[in-house]
Amino acid sequence: MSGRGKGAKAKSKAKSRSSRAGLQFPVGRVHRFLKKGNYGNRVGAGAPVYLAAVLEYLTAEILELAGNAARDNKKSRIIPRHLQLAVRNDEELNKLLGGVTIAQGGVLPNIQTVLLPKKTGKSA
């Protein structure tokens, strides 16, 4: 006898909440952080899944743009400079991360139009 009773099914392999939701980010860890962080007395079952999905999407978006910046600079490795270029050149990400300083990121190349040399109109 297996000890499961009459009609009980065999216990299936444990499946993580991340794999159930089709995510790479850890739903269980996000849930633990939400509970520990004093954001509320109770945390619903869907909240950590949603938050993990949002974090995964934002990370993928930034990495995609940073990868493009690295390829434009003929590099195969993403460095903080590429992250800075990716975030600051994207309008929405720049608005979201406006107050964030990326270490070793540098600045965007920008010359004010007033400082540029004036074009002389030589007519031949």
UniProtKB/Swiss-Prot annotation:
UniProt cross-references to SUPFAM superfamilies, sorted A to Z: Histone-fold
A Gene Ontology term for the protein's cellular component: nucleosome
Entry superkingdom: Eukaryota
N5-methylglutamine, modified sites: 104
Annotated SMART domains: H2A
InterPro entries xref list: Histone-fold, Histone_H2A, Histone_H2A/H2B/H3, Histone_H2A_C, Histone_H2A_CS
Post-translational modification note: Monoubiquitination of Lys-119 gives a specific tag for epigenetic transcriptional repression. Phosphorylation of Ser-2 directly represses transcription.
Bias (Basic residues): 1-18
Residue(s) of cross-link: Glycyl lysine isopeptide (Lys-Gly) (interchain with G-Cter in ubiquitin): 119
Keywords associated with the record: Acetylation, Chromosome, DNA-binding, Isopeptide bond, Methylation, Nucleosome core, Nucleus, Phosphoprotein, Ubl conjugation
Subcellular location: Nucleus; Chromosome
Residue(s) carrying N-acetylserine: 2
Molecular functions per Gene Ontology: DNA binding; protein heterodimerization activity; structural constituent of chromatin
Region (Disordered): 1-21
Disulfide bridge positions per record: none
Modified residues (Phosphoserine): 2
Range of residues in the leader sequence: none
Gene3D superfamilies found in the cross-reference section: Histone, subunit A
Subunit structure: The nucleosome is a histone octamer containing two molecules each of H2A, H2B, H3 and H4 assembled in one H3-H4 heterotetramer and two H2A-H2B heterodimers. The octamer wraps approximately 147 bp of DNA.
PANTHER family per the UniProt record, alphabetical: HISTONE H2A
Protein purpose: Core component of nucleosome. Nucleosomes wrap and compact DNA into chromatin, limiting DNA accessibility to the cellular machineries which require DNA as a template. Histones thereby play a central role in transcription regulation, DNA repair, DNA replication and chromosomal stability. DNA accessibility is regulated via a complex set of post-translational modifications of histones, also called histone code, and nucleosome remodeling.
Family, similarity comment: Belongs to the histone H2A family.
The protein's name in its UniProt record: Late histone H2A.2.1
